[in-house]
């Protein structure tokens, strides 16, 4: 059993996850390595769900990069060197004090 599993939040739709990803890319595009904000570009769902840090995540592509958005909208990750790196809560210690 996973003590961190979110049980009170519904699974959100792919469309909702895409909106969160669009905003997250808009807020963090330089951090991901883009030379300009691609959030208005096409973001496409890859018809795939992966597990990252114990959470089911929808997989999306945008301007040559791959992202994973937790179905509970609890986190956004981007694929970097074969691993998913957190794009939300990545520069904070909020969860680890």
Describe every region a protein language model picked out.
Residues 33, 47-48, 82, 91:
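Short, flexible coil/linker elements and helix-boundary hinge sites characteristic
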Residues 37-76:
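Exposed beta-strand-loop-beta-strand "reactive/processing" segments of non-cytosolic proteins
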Residues 3-44:
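Short, non-transmembrane alpha-helical segments in secretory-pathway proteins
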Residues 1, 67-97:
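A short, surface-exposed interaction/processing loop segment used at functional sites
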Residues 1-6, 17, 21, 50-52, ...:
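Extended hydrophobic/Leu-rich segments
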């Amino acid at each position: 059993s996973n003590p961190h599993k979110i049980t009170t939040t519904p699974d959100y739709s792919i469309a909702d996850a895409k909106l969160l990803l669009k905003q997250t890319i808009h807020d963090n595009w330089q951090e991901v390595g883009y030379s300009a904000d691609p959030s208005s570009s096409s973001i496409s769902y890859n018809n795939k769900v992966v597990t990252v840090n114990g959470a089911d995540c929808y997989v999306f592509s945008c301007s040559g990069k791959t992202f994973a958005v937790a179905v509970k909208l609890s986190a956004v990750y981007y694929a970097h060197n074969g691993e998913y790196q957190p794009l939300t809560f990545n520069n904070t210690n909020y969860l680890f004090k």
